[in-house]
């Protein structure tokens, strides 16, 4: 009788390889579902997992079947209603003959399948959410290091997933183990076989001694055969480790308008944008510094919690935030050693005489030293003087980008538009 002993340490993850293959195969449908789900989430749970639904038709597998046309006779088991040459009516369009949202009318016939729904983890969700995104114009200033990691081979390990198994190394270990476990028995077997051959040719015949030797030889051979050809102890997997790669250090300035003209819905959309930005930076680049600046009539550098949740408000003077950013850059972040980025969110409402000053500060002080400056305007109203001043900057500076957000659904597409990974030709 054969016995199978499951000694896998990661038995509960035995379908990991199949899961990864499924995520790769249906990446387009999963990313579409994620982009729709991100707009339905609250600010606090944007980095948790997600239930993803895929239409059943999209996950159908290819199969071999009879071609159309020709004459064929078929026997369908369980048929007690129809005979040959009967015409079967098509189910009515309103019936349940397919997947749907459940908003149609009821039907007494027809059948279909619901959409396929499965759960992805937090890490899988964030990987897909920020795929193909990067900080634009990142350069290696002074060869200062930022811990950006790349995967490298690092020998072998005794644990892993089946996709990483090393067949050659596992068989080498199997051979070494079987040699070590059976070496003594094989020497003893060789000695008994030599003794048996000597006795079998001697006179007079020693039948009892021959029978004893044959039994011992059979027992030794059985013991040798019971040593398994391969054991979990022999298995070796290719090991990979993440090593820091020489890269550049970066700082991201987050500027947000919290004036009285920003209603709660607009502030929530700005918070969503910056939370996406924070998750992206903290996940992609381990040592990126983030500077948070809130402003109304006065600007103030704050920590992360105060930036997102403080209730302080007031009038609107955007230039106060730009002046404070310029001061912080001069004090702490030398442009020759740091890649400086900035993202500004506002509803576009600003004191009219202040907008030309914003244009001047950006054109003369900030844009010459930053790698990339992005401005998002969150409003359903017509653009005002600040937007028009910034349009002149966009025409003059390649490192300045601006986008308009009207509704919550625009946040994620705009975020991807601003931080889309550049090709080699574009970055050059």
UniProtKB/Swiss-Prot annotation:
Q: Cite the record's Basic and acidic residues compositional bias ranges.
A: 78-90
Q: Which positions are tagged coiled coil?
A: none
Q: Which InterPro entries match?
A: UPF0229
List where Gly residues composition bias occurs: 92-103
Pfam families, sorted: DUF444 (PF04285)
Domain of life (superkingdom): Bacteria
Region named Disordered: 78-111
PANTHER family from the UniProt entry: UPF0229 PROTEIN YEAH (PTHR30510:SF2)
Q: Which NCBIfam families match?
A: PRK05325.1-2, PRK05325.1-3
Q: Which family does it belong to?
A: Belongs to the UPF0229 family.
Q: What is this protein called?
A: UPF0229 protein YeaH
Quick one: which gene encodes this?
A: yeaH
């Amino acid at each position: 009788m054969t016995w199978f002993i499951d000694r896998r340490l990661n038995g509960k993850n035995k379908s990991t390889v199949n899961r990864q293959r499924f995520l790769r195969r249906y990446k387009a449908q999963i990313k579409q579902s994620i982009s729709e789900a991100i707009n339905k989430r609250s600010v606090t749970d944007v980095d948790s997992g997600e239930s993803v639904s895929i239409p059943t038709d999209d996950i159908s597998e290819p199969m071999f079947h009879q071609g159309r046309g020709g004459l064929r006779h078929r026997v369908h088991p369980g048929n007690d209603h129809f005979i040959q040459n009967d015409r079967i009516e098509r189910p009515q369009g309103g019936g349940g003959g397919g997947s749907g949202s459940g908003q149609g009318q009821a039907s007494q016939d027809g059948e279909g399948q619901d959409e396929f729904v499965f759960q992805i983890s937090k890490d899988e969700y964030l990987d897909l959410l920020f795929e193909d995104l990067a900080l634009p114009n990142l350069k290696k200033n002074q060869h200062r290091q930022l811990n950006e990691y790349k995967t490298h081979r690092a020998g072998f390990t005794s644990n892993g997933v089946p996709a990483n198994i090393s067949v050659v190394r596992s068989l080498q270990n199997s051979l070494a183990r079987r040699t070590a476990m059976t070496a003594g028995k094989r020497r003893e077997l060789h000695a008994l076989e030599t003794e048996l051959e000597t006795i079998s040719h001697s006179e007079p015949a020693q039948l009892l001694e021959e029978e004893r030797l044959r039994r011992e030889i059979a027992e030794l051979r059985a013991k040798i055969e019971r040593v398994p050809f391969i054991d979990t102890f022999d298995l070796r997997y290719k090991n990979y480790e993440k090593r820091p790669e020489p890269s550049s250090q970066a700082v991201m300035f987050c500027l947000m308008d919290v004036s009285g003209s920003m209603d709660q819905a607009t502030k929530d959309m700005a918070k969503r944008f910056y939370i996406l930005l924070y998750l992206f930076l903290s996940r992609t680049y381990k040592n990126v510094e983030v500077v948070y600046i809130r402003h109304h009539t006065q600007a103030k550098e704050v920590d992360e919690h105060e930036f997102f949740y403080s209730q302080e408000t007031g009038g609107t003077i955007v230039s106060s935030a730009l002046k404070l950013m310029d001061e912080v850059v001069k004090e702490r972040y030398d442009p020759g050693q740091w890649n400086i980025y900035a993202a500004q969110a506002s509803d576009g409402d600003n004191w009219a005489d202040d907008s030309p000053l914003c244009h001047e500060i950006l054109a003369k002080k900030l844009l010459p030293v930053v790698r990339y400056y992005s401005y998002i305007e969150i409003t359903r109203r017509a653009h005002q003087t600040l937007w028009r001043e910034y349009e002149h900057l966009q025409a003059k500076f390649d490192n300045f980008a601006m986008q308009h957000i009207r509704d919550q659904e625009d946040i994620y597409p705009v975020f991807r538009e601003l931080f889309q990974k550049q090709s080699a030709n574009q970055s050059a």
